[in-house]
Amino acid sequence: MKTRLAASLAAAVLAFAGANLAQAAQVSGAVGATGQGDMTYRIGVSFDWDKKWLESSTGYLTGYWDAAYTYWEGGDASGAHSLSFSPVFTYEFSGFTYTPYIEAGIGLAAFSKTDVGDQRMGSAVNFEDRIGFGLKLPGEQKVGIRAMHYSNAGIKQPNDGIESYSLFYSKGF
C-alpha cells in the first residue's frame, strides 16, 4: 500500500513536470535538520505561476508549484525518503536590489515509512506545511531559510509530526 501511494505521487509529480516543460524551471537544493537533530537533504524542481495579484508599491503576491525528494537521516542509521508536491504562495517586496520575499504553502508528502527518526507519523501520506523567507538574486537565483512541518492532521494516530528547518538555494534554467 505504501509503495503504491509513493508510486502514485511520483507519477503525478512527473506528469505535472512534463506538462510544464515550456515554463522555466527552478532547481533547488536544501540542507537542514529536524527538531530532533537528524539531518535532511532535499532536492526539488519548481515552476513559477507567472501571475501577480494585489500589486502595490510594497510588492505583489505570486507563487509556484514545488515538487521534491527529501532524504531524512534517522537516529538508527536507517533513513526515510519522501516525495512531496505543493502549491506555494510568495509575497515579493518591491524596491530592493535583491528582492526579499516570504512564502507559505500546504501540500502533500508521501513517506517511505511511518517512523521518521524518533517520530511516529501514523501514516505514510502527510500534509506538508511551510513558511520561509528568501532573497531573489541576479541570474534567476534564490537563497533563503524555510521551516516545514509534516503531519497527517490527526487523521490517523499516532501523529507525532516532524519539522525540518533548512537553508536552500535555487537556480532557474
Feature map (PLM): residue ranges:
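Residue-level signature of outer-membrane beta-barrel architecture
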Residues: 33, 47-49, 91-93, 135-137, ...
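Transmembrane beta-barrel strands of outer-membrane/channel proteins
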Residues: 29-33, 63-71, 102-108, 145-149
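Short loop/turn motifs that connect adjacent beta-strands in outer-membrane beta-barrel proteins
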Residues: 21-25, 50-61, 94-100, 140
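Outer-membrane beta-barrel "beta-signal"
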Residues: 41-45, 161-173
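Cleavable N-terminal export/targeting peptides
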Residues: 1-24
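Extracellular loop and loop/strand-boundary signature of outer-membrane beta-barrel proteins
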Residues: 30-31, 73-75, 116-119, 152-155
